[in-house]
Amino acid sequence: YVYLAGGLFVLCRILLSFYRMFQLIRNGKRRSYGKYKLIVVSEPISSFCWGKYIVVSVSDYSQQSTDGILLHETMHLRYRHTLDLLCMQCLLILYWFNPAIWLLKRELQEVHEFEADNGVLNTGIDATRYQLLLVKKAVGTRLYSMANGFNHSKLKKRITMMLKERTNRW
């Protein structure tokens, strides 16, 4: 019964997160952004993406930093990070009692951020400007746990990874 109760608790948390996220998507103003749907919401949230949706706050949408934010979220969508997160949520429901699965989730999100940052930098955006954007966004609001977005706690590591010399694998 304890296993079942824990699994139901994790499932309820995930469903609540989905509900809140889809409320934002449903109530936001829709705009087209390439092959994705851009949702602009009035709530002061950190930008995130899920499926084909990129969700940004009105303040982020109206600032000059919009390009960097949208490019970052587009990279998450392009690399299909939503599928990874969805699989991880299913594993969390089944193996909620195992601390390793929670660590794996955190590491997966960190790798997603590294991949998105690398994708942004590969487009030719100014690295210093992008890093300043990350620092600026790090003082923002809490993220939705089900979605990709700017990860506050790993910011220094992300910037360090961006500054590393890239060497050829071969």
Predicted regions and their residues:
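Membrane-embedded and juxtamembrane structural elements of multi-pass membrane proteins
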Residues: 1-170
